[in-house]
Amino acid sequence: MVVRRKVHVLLIARSFHSYTPCFRVTTRGKRQRSKSKQQAKVELDHTRELDNDQATETVVDRSVGPEKDIESINKDFLQRTKGLEPDIELKQLPQIKQEFNQRYKDRYVKPSEDWYVNSWRSLTKPKIPLYKLINSDFQLITKLKAPNPMEFQPVQLMESPLNVGDFVLLKMRPNELAMCVSLPSSTMDPRYTFVTIDGTMCFATKNRVLLRIPHKLPAGIHSLIQPESHHKHLPIGTVKNFSNQTNILPIVARQLITSRYPAQISKLAWKDLPITTKKLQLLHRSLQNYMGPWQIPFFTLVGLVQKLDLNKALDDKNGINYLTSLVNNYHTVNDIPINSPTFVSTYWAIMQQQESNLWGEIHLNTALLSPISVTIIPLKSQHLYYAQVIEKLEANSYREVNKFVKLVNERKYRDISALYPSVIQLLKDFAAGNFHNNGIIVALISKIFRKIERYKDCDITRDICQDLINEITPNSIPNPLLLNMDLALPASSKLVKWQQKLYDLTNIEELQWKKSGTDDDRYDFGDLRVFCIDSETAHEIDDGVSVKNYGRDGLYTLYIHIADPTSMFPESTNVDIEGISTDILNVALKRSFTTYLPDTVVPMLPQSICHLSDLGKQGQRTKTISFSVDVKITSKCSGKSIEIMYDSFKIRKGIVSNFPKATYEDVDRILGTPNSEASPVKKDLESLSMISKLLREQRIKNSNAVIFGEGFNKGLVMLNADSEGELTEVTFSDQEETLSTILVSEMMILANTLTGRYFAENKIGGVFRCYKQLPLGEVAQQQYDSMITSTKKGIFPKLKDIVKLSSLLNSSFYTGRPFRHEMIGAKQYLTVTSPLRRFPDLINHLQIHRHLQKKPLCFNQTQIDSLIWPIQSRADILKRASRNSSTYWTLNYLKKLTKLEPERTFDVMVTSVPQNGFTGCVFPDLSFARGTLKLHPSSMHYPMIGDIVKNCKISKIDCLEGMLELEKL
């Protein structure tokens, strides 16, 4: 309807149906003229404005006159009305049809034809006539020779990182699968391009991926996304980096490639969701441990869901026995292919049941971009307990909440502690991050704080929960994150308390007796100097290095001696034992690693075993697993080079006893002090230092190893005791690379690399460490290669370079397969140098013991593969916990600083592509102070990744949530 003063003209211009135009002009007056007079005046009156006191209705009869008269009327009408409404152009139907068809052809048909012909070059692609490309017969898809992604093996996630063709769930769209269609284009924009089922294009970095299903595109597809060609119509594509360039996914690419399987998997996953939810409820009852939370490998849980028969599980007579038998043998499902719809529906069902406090956090691995474990919450102490707490607090119009709030407002904290321990526990769990997707708990806590006078206007955060806890119970733990159930410290779990009790009761005399057993099969290294280089405050000393200089032909023998705690366990010798049978080793597996946090250190093994196995006690004969290899140093005009004599590599059980005192500071001081008559100790250290530098140069030049330079790991958190003895005073230190740190790291890398090669050549199953470089776009790959080239020239990436490259770098992970570690530059990399601190090393030591005795190995390949998931899960949990604790203390420091200096401003470095006026940032001198920067609205140019933005003020801090927001002034 187009309105022009008093004239109303009704037009039908967008229908494809033929019609005869009808124009109606209506005006008001005192009387109506005859029909014949109306028809007579139509040509005079239909565009002329009439007076208010006139009443006229003018009609053109659409049923009279030949077709050419109609066309003449149309033409005359369009000519007369031209320019009445500048924003509206009136057109005839044939012209509308013609222009629509041209737009459709330019926007949709031609891009699809170009893509099909030029971007998909394969003899196996379906032969579809170009005029039938869009909405072609679906049956033709069956001719595509592509892997079926309706099921996959978990090892496929290890074999290849995120790539074009993979299906993902994104944080921004967690309810539908999308396909990765384009790789990061450059360091200035490290975002991937994803396309949803309906063709919507979105951009995100890999840390926004929640779940990944590996999938390879059909052969011959060069690209899926293409720049939208220039045409005279409005563009329909999506802008990524430049406003004058839009990108499109051709319709035929969406119909044939990107939407088919994601749509099928999503549809089946939603269909299966109610059944999967029921299965998970049943499995939870059998899997939960009343003593505390624990993590189950995610793929094991999916396998159980696939295998569980609801009819058998719900049988009144045998259902419980069926479930018990299934769960007790859950480790046997690791070889079952994972059904993709079940994988997705299990993820969705767990997300739903987190609100019922049945499942805890889903732990995501940043290398595989997949869930690898989920925390099972105890039924009685968590699920049922909080159901009762919520019911009690909500009863009688929140009467108990009102009573609690009244006591808080009156500051009667002693009464609160006596009457409301359940509310205090609720607040502690919320502050510790023990609730996930639990809207009921969040709503309840919000209601509590909205009634407390001093908090009612505050944002509801975990920080203010902890503030209230500190008011009620002043002696609360300084860092609430230590109570997180995933961290599993003794303070948060009965199960962990029991495990610690087992450790404390370890029989030292029995271990001493075992340690003093026969050493006939061990090589005694006599007076060979063993340098155990570590810090003064080291909790476990499990490695030492030695060198023998032959004084001719540049020949040296390197020795890496490693503590041998596994010799104390029967698994190292008893061939009747397959896998792990000792209680202590089972607990060590649960811990998997020594926990290092700013606040505390929790050893993986009992202290008694660590003390008995430690190296470094001068004169004490100590058992080792010793690795040795000969190297040859050659002097050339361009400098020295090193050759590793691989055939000389040996693994032996050893005895060492000569331990010269050597901390990092001692070694740096000795190496940095000129002395014309060097002592034997200094000569050894100089030889080791020289060899370690040559080993590093070789890794960089021959194997493309990546070494980070200045600015990496700045602002590491250190805690000091306050006046009351609590570790709450925060200081910061920078991790510096010195001659001593290079010496130790290169010797350990050498031992792990050579042992990985040895395991692979001798087909010994072990736990390898792997790193796979991400596939990148052409420009991004060139920038990465440029960094490698600079590193080979001795120019290591600094903080700005690291920030630019960080999103293009992958993470390392544990695997049972001898894959490459591309970051270190090793064809195989198997860790053996820290058996007191890492369970993977302990497993590999048990394999070495059996291999050296020529006995059957302790673990077969299936057992190794099943151990990978809990180990990797624990590694991810501890890595996240360490980062969260360091962030907590760093933000606490900044929070106190801003209270003292409210107008204090900071300089920050940009870490992400600016979007909607916001960008990620980091404090250059504080690695754990990361947040979001709100850019100034008047900014004409947004900063780029790696740029420094000055004069920024902190606007919000939530230390427990790790949230930091700044504004550019």
Swiss-Prot record:
One of its GO terms (biological process) is mRNA catabolic process. Pfam families: RNB. Residues 28-38 have a biased composition (Basic residues). Residues 1-41 form a transit peptide. Its main location: mitochondrion. Keywords: Exonuclease, Hydrolase, Mitochondrion, Nuclease, RNA-binding, Transit peptide. GO terms for cellular component: mitochondrial degradosome; mitochondrial matrix; mitochondrion. SUPFAM superfamilies: Nucleic acid-binding proteins. Its EC number is 3.1.13.1. Residues 522-853 form the RNB domain. It is found in: Mitochondrion matrix. Residues 40-51 have a biased composition (Basic and acidic residues). Residues 28-54 are annotated as: Disordered. InterPro entries: NA-bd_OB-fold (IPR012340), RNase_II/R (IPR001900), RNase_II/R_CS (IPR022966), RNR_Ribonuclease (IPR050180). Essential for mitochondrial biogenesis. Belongs to the RNR ribonuclease family. Present with 1070 molecules/cell in log phase SD medium. PANTHER family: EXORIBONUCLEASE II, MITOCHONDRIAL (PTHR23355:SF59), RIBONUCLEASE (PTHR23355). This is Exoribonuclease II, mitochondrial.
